[in-house]
Amino acid sequence: MIGPLESVLYRDGATMVERHGRRVAANFGARAGEEAACLKAVGIADRSDRTTLDVRGDVDAALLALAAIGERAWSSYAGPERAVVRCEFEDTAACLAALGSASDVTRSYAAIAVVGPNAEALLDAADLPSSAVTLHEAGLSWEILVPPALGPVVWDQLLEAGAPLGVACVGLDAIENLTASKRLRA
């Protein structure tokens, strides 16, 4: 399936791969340079390969149950009786089991990771739409979820707002290597 960010990813030089039925950027030409950008400034990456779950009702109880999964899932309140949960594709079944009554809404969002020491500054500088949900994954890693039609617009806004901060387009190869090596911890 074509991902919601594919047009801007190709435009910006991505080498595309398929992950869990979605096409995402593996790299933008040089994994080492992409990793360096994430460690020294800020990188943005397509994270449409992950699962997005919608939780409604007794959100506090659901998120408490989800805590048993640990760092494999992260969440954000999206209203008084609603939360959005993100996890790696392979952890989807465990998250759904822990949450009880969550809905898989992965295809309802474009997901953009914002990673690095300048990530918070970029999030502050970007003019994100009111429909955006921002989640703090861990350490220096954040995610922005927006409706698919807004994905390319938000990608471009992040590139523009992030230019003074040293923003770079980053592929999953770099993100996954940094995550595995735990070099993105604050």
For each of these PLM feature ranges, what is it?
Residues 1-186:
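Basic, glycine/lysine-rich polyanion-binding surfaces/domains
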